[in-house]
Amino acid sequence: MTSAVAVFKTDEIQGEVVVTPYKSGVKLNSYFTRLPPGKHGFHIHKAGDLRGEGCMGLCEHYDIGRNTHGGKPGSTRKRHTGDLGNIEIKGKRQEFQKSYFLKGIKPKDLWGRSIIVHKDEDDLGKGGFEDSKTTGHSGARIGCAIFGRSTCAPKTLKNRRH
């Protein structure tokens, strides 16, 4: 099965996102073992150009329509295709795992695109800030990864022995 995979490997952020076909879209499985404390905006971005400081070459949020920023998949209001809400590690386990379902796209649509962890909480487009309707006022880009093509058997971070 062909999928899309993005891997985060920095001192602050470690994790991976695996995208596989699912019904009329994709299933996006995210798994993180290291994140800074607090909630962080989590979005798929349009480009995959890592040149430049702080993931700045990755452009705006990925969207197959003409939508404004909104909540996570499954929200009742219109949203960018790449709006995934917030991620946060809670408790002593120090890991975050969540699955998302995105309609109308295939794993290959994400190849070469990026996924970003932002410094601050995403206001889901509901804040009164100038950038609430475009970025969710999520702040700086503190971690980014590019989706690559994978056709091999999954070797997920969760299943590896260290």
Label the predicted regions:
Residues 1-162:
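N-terminal leader/targeting pre-sequences
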